[in-house]
């Protein structure tokens, strides 16, 4: 269910990337582009956290903002966290 929701939420981003973005001049100051970042963030972190990361990225992407390499942060799932003690 969760994966399907992520795919559904990423679909409009993919439509933008394939249909709208090619006819517009390049404008994103970051790599990966904001749309690629948003799609990866939603697929990696889920709809809520990934959407929040995408919104924060879009807010930073303006002429007076930063630029350069800005990857999606790694997932913070509990299974990625090592145990506190080695029993």
Swiss-Prot record:
Claim: DNA-binding is one of the keywords in the record: no
Subcellular location: Cell inner membrane
Chain intervals for the UniProt region annotation (Disordered): 64-87
Top-level taxonomic group: Bacteria
An annotated GO cellular component: plasma membrane
Membrane topology: Peripheral membrane protein
Cleavable signal peptide: none
Keywords tagged on the record: Cell inner membrane, Cell membrane, Membrane
One Pfam family matching this protein: YidD
Family: Belongs to the UPF0161 family.
Role of this protein: Could be involved in insertion of integral membrane proteins into the membrane.
Full protein name: Putative membrane protein insertion efficiency factor
Organism field: Desulfovibrio desulfuricans (strain ATCC 27774 / DSM 6949 / MB)
